[in-house]
Amino acid sequence: MREDYFYTEGLTVGYQGVPLIREIAFQLKKGEILTLIGPNGAGKTTILKSLIRQLKPLAGVIVLEGQKADEMSGRDFARKLSVVLTERVRPEMMTCKEVVATGRYPYTGKFGVLSKEDWKIVDEAVRLVHIEDLAERDFTKTSDGQKQRVMLARALCQQPDILVLDEPTSFLDIRYKLEFLSIIQEMARNDRLTVILSLHELDLAERISDKVLCVRGDRIDRFGTPEEIFCGDYISELYGMTAGHYDAGTGELELQPVSGVPKVFVIAGGGRGKAVFRRLQRQGMPFA
């Protein structure tokens, strides 16, 4: 019997019967974080939408805790898995707290009435994501970054075993970006929440992930640990970089070096020369 908590086998995804990415296979244990990376338009969102049953897979299986996802009822699936997508949600005449509370609907009766215990869970989700100051504000009158935090609270309010997020940090400033990912990582470690997300920030993907899935157009190019993915020239190759490169040693993107005969020789160690390198590059001065 397999020990994997969530896995896919022979998964093919696409639109209107036309395959986009074939033979998607990955395995996750409970409490692991999987990050999808790859160029724009490579198919990361299509994969995520297929995992959450928003798109019907063209072939293969998705298995959650030993049960095929397509055999689960909608209510059971919603209790196991919650989602935060990049698509805009615009509920009219609802406060942020009321939007968060909709995450409890899979647990309510047909009239959708929340119990005192449900409201305690709502309040805890609001507190966890630090949106107390937004709770009574009209959801439509908040910024994109604030909406993203509200939707995370809504997803956590569902008390899922698996959390799926599509580019969750896109509209967040630096403070909330780090806070957002810290919350997710803490819940994965302490509550064994399994997380599947897509990110454009490679430095954050390298730091937060247990596993990384590299999407390249019509195929999955690699699946492995960050140490197996963020090494050598692979990231530069995956993204087809021509105006610079990804430095696997520092985990940073670097611009094309200034051409010409070096006029300056920099001696440094332990990353202490980075500020000098940056300044010389800005001034267009070749260095070695």
Give the positions of each predicted feature.
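ABC ATPase nucleotide-binding domains
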Residues: Y239-A288
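Helix-to-loop junction immediately C-terminal to a conserved catalytic motif
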Residues: I52
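Conserved ABC ATPase signature
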Residues: G112-V113, D138-T142, Q146
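Conserved ABC ATPase "signature" region
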Residues: A101, K116-A135, Q159
